[in-house]
Amino acid sequence: MTFFPEKKGYSLKEFHEEYSKRLSKALSQLDTKSLEEVYLQLAKGVKNNSTIFSCGNGGSSSIAEHLACDFVKGVSTDSEAKPKVFPLLSTPILTAIANDIGYEEVFAFQVERYAKENDILLSVSSSGNSENVVKAIEKAKSLDLFTISFVAFDGGRVKKISDLAIHVEVDNYGMAEDAHHALMHIFAQFLRLQSISEKEKIGKIKF
């Protein structure tokens, strides 16, 4: 099995074209049924005043944090929706748990203390095998949270144990993160669009 890039001898033009082609193909081939199901769960959670917790490592952590920005600020602007999104990514809390207990517990520890039944955990994991994400999902399910994940590569354990997973079928971390970031924007902007009561504003406000 080989992963992109498979060779050193690309020109920048060739690399750009191949990267763009593969990323575009992966996005266009996403399972639309899964997209719809995830959107409905997120919309239901927002309507029911549930908290959406988010987590991830590395580049995925930035997507999990950006989710809060675009849902809390973006979705609520000019709309009736008031999402509650809480990234489990406070540096002091993460480092305290990692130092005193173990890095594999950094998210599960917080889920156990913050979450309540019917909240949502949205996990971002390109590999699908990050131990701290797996443990967070397991803890969330034990507390009756609904679990959603964005994954890539073969989906890993995260895909298997999540209630819903959107699987971006790419074998490159950059493409996985690009696609997951796009998904975050798609869900945030679509939820905002559906929550705008003054329809005459649509087309006149920036998304």
What are these regions (language model features)?
Residues 113, 121, 176-207:
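A charged, well-structured terminal subsegment
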Residues 150-162:
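Short, glycine/polar-rich helix-capping loops at beta-to-alpha or helix-loop-helix junctions
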Residues 60-65, 129-136, 158:
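Short glycine/serine/threonine-rich phosphate/pyrophosphate-binding segments
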Residues 28-48:
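A short, well-structured juxtamembrane/interface segment
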Residues 1-30:
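Generic N-terminal amphipathic, Lys/Arg-enriched alpha-helix
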Residues 44-115:
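Glycine-rich, small/polar surface segments that engage phosphate groups of diverse ligands
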Residues 89, 125, 151, 166-174:
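Short beta->alpha connector loops at strand-helix junctions that form conserved
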